[in-house]
Amino acid sequence: MLGWILYQKDTLQDSYENTRFLEEAKLLQITLKVVHPPDFGWVLGGDFPLLYKGKAISLPDFVIPRLGAMTDTLTWNLLHFFHLKGVRLFNSLSLIRLAQNKLDCLFQLASLGIPVPKTTALHLVESTYSIQRVFDFPLVVKNNVGTHGEGIILCTSDQILEDLMPILLEQTNQNFIVQEYVDTRPGEDIRIVLTQNTVLGTMKRIAGRDQWKSNFTLGGKVEPYPWDDSLDSIASKIQKNLTFDLLGIDLLMTESGYVVNEINSAPGFKGMELALKNNMARLILEQCIEFVPG
């Protein structure tokens, strides 16, 4: 069986995950390679071979896209090509696109009755006065497309927001959202990793010293977190209503319960393996083996 990990060149964020995938693939007798979207050439409408670094190459049995929010137009085109040719993608195109857009994702979750933080699009509230009518300080401003805790700003006062607004509104090629800052458990969140049918793991992420973002990639700590009925209800709704192979869910803890902050179509699992001492790479690859046709 041949599989590819589709990954961005010169990016180290998921180097741990890629290494673990390659280690476990060898033990499972899967031929697995890390490949990069810009190195491919393809043509629609005809019997043309797929090219990789200028040479014809056979299609794999499956592809694991690991770009998440960094999935650009070039990569989208390549993923559509793979889909057209019958290559099994882990995840689906629809799930990758949904997870890439934070606001669309929150709309989808809210429509399922899943609690989400109070959120709006920045262009709908183009003055600090409008924001102050709805949100208390501190509040969070996020790039609508972002990953690994990047593009997130904590505004602690109306003056900081007022200074920031002109800069953000000039970024015509980017969209931003405004979100309440959930301070019930500051610097902490819950990460769930699950498949369509199974919960693979749950952990708490705790921000590092002088940090307010809990991402493990930013130096945060991780520890196991017990499963409970509220988490089960949220996970079950997502599993029943979204189609996916692998999903990371990030939740914040409020006084009234959990709220889902965002989802991730290519969740990192270094922290999960460290906290739970489980083999996430193997569990994910076993899903690939199970669902690849033939």
Regions found by a protein language model. Give the residues of each.
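Hydrophobic residue at the +6 position relative to the catalytic HRD Asp in the kinase catalytic loop
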Residues: 249-251
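ATP-binding N-terminal substructure of ATP-dependent carboxylate-amine bond-forming enzymes
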Residues: 1-90
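Protein kinase-like catalytic core scaffold
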Residues: 139, 200-201, 247, 259-261
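C-terminal active-site "lid" helix and adjoining low-complexity regulatory extension at the edge
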Residues: 230, 240-244, 253-294
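Short glycine-rich anion-binding loops that position phosphate/pyrophosphate groups of nucleotides
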Residues: 68-70, 144-146, 266
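Phosphate-binding site of ATP-dependent enzymes
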Residues: 150, 154-242
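Residue-level detector of anion-binding/catalytic polar loops
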Residues: 31, 88, 115, 138, ...
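Active-site nucleotide/adenylate-binding loops and adjacent lid/helix of ATP-dependent enzymes
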Residues: 2-22, 57-58, 82-86, 94-182, ...
